[in-house]
Amino acid sequence: MTPEHLPTEQYEAQLAEKVVRLQTMMAPFAAPVPEVFRSPVSHYRMRAEFRLWHDGDDLYHIIFDQQTRSRIRVDSFPAASALINQLMTAMLEGVRNNPVLRHKLFQIDYLTTLSNQAVVSLLYHKKLDDTWREQAEALRDALRAQGLNVHLIGRATKTKIELDQDYIDERLPVGGREMIYRQVENSFTQPNAAMNIQMLEWALDVTKEATGDLLELYCGNGNFSLALARNFDRVLATEIAKPSVAAAQYNIAANHIDNVQIIRMAAEEFTQAMNGVREFNRLQGIDLQSYQCETIFVDPPRSGLDSETEKMVQAYPRILYISCNPETLCRNLETLSQTHNVTRLALFDQFPYTHHMECGVLLTRK
């Protein structure tokens, strides 16, 4: 695979290999046959980041080969959304012959939505001033005149200039409802929107018979907790990143959801609060003991759950675990399978043409 060519004819074979690999990894835990969710074979990534290479008068996007670290020129990127590909061309045309915008520009980050909105961040090794802002506003207006719904951001050391806003609002059809998700620049969002819809609908399906309340750790912008709120009496969710918490609060209001409470704290801190080890001012006014959480949802970083959180989640009758790293999932399952059975397993092909796998498991208490 090269950045400008996707081996779409090999998609079925690479997906089949992932299915076999996941089944082999999950065999020690008596997991059921995985439900397999396919990705679109192209234009599936909603975000992309490129370094910029200045070559005389020419200017182009590059990425670095992961093995050799050599530069690879990228004029088109079929893995990314059609909107990103449009913007890649339009941005370079707007910047290439503009000394103010081009000078010391070293990276461009693109974030797009299925609803055809975009935030583009330009990263510089220089101070940004009012002249830069004027030129950037002119570029933004020219892009919008081409029909591109785009917001521009300038970044430099200790500097962030938003011309309008630093977010876009995604709209996803999930289980017969349209969900609105505010996505903030430089914050985590699911990269493959089509796969995100399938993950949300799978999570809805596996919890449709759930009772009581839901606890979610690492909730981000509320991606899962807001979609799952319809299956539970109440949802209590934790997140540590301030921009994500603010986006989650907006998303709660935008989706007219009244049974979700977001707490800004780390999963490890929440474990201490639940166990009565520490008291936190952030929890004033929230009666943790009033929640009857019978399901816990975790979508941890690649490192998986730490040992204390492993112990904490074992206290819940149902554990819904989305993993971007099956190796650490299996490590966690060595502990979790002592008290719970794997009753559902899913493979989400979030990252086609790579060895990476995203998967989901539902565990129920033995």
Swiss-Prot record:
This protein's name: tRNA/tmRNA (uracil-C(5))-methyltransferase
Binding residue positions for S-adenosyl-L-methionine: Q190, Y218, N223, E239, D299
Organism: Klebsiella pneumoniae (strain 342)
Lineage, highest ranks first: Bacteria, Pseudomonadati, Pseudomonadota, Gammaproteobacteria, Enterobacterales
Keywords, alphabetical: Methyltransferase, S-adenosyl-L-methionine, Transferase, tRNA processing
Classification via Pfam families: tRNA_U5-meth_tr
Gene Ontology MF terms: rRNA binding; tRNA (uracil(54)-C5)-methyltransferase activity, S-adenosyl methionine-dependent; tRNA binding
Superkingdom of origin organism: Bacteria
NCBIfam families cross-referenced by the UniProt entry: trmA_only
Stated family: Belongs to the class I-like SAM-binding methyltransferase superfamily. RNA M5U methyltransferase family. TrmA subfamily.
Residues of the active site: C324 (nucleophile), E358 (proton acceptor)
Reactions catalysed according to its record: uridine(54) in tRNA + S-adenosyl-L-methionine = 5-methyluridine(54) in tRNA + S-adenosyl-L-homocysteine + H(+); uridine(341) in tmRNA + S-adenosyl-L-methionine = 5-methyluridine(341) in tmRNA + S-adenosyl-L-homocysteine + H(+)
GO biological process entries: tRNA methylation
Signal peptide residue numbers: none
PROSITE patterns assigned to the protein according to its UniProt record, in alphabetical order: SAM_MT_RNA_M5U (PS51687), TRMA_1 (PS01230), TRMA_2 (PS01231)
Purpose of the protein: Dual-specificity methyltransferase that catalyzes the formation of 5-methyluridine at position 54 (m5U54) in all tRNAs, and that of position 341 (m5U341) in tmRNA (transfer-mRNA).
InterPro entries tied to this protein: MeTrfase_TrmA_AS, MeTrfase_TrmA_CS, SAM-dependent_MTases_sf, TrmA_MeTrfase, U5_MeTrfase_fam
EC number: 2.1.1.-, 2.1.1.35
Recorded GO CC terms: cytosol
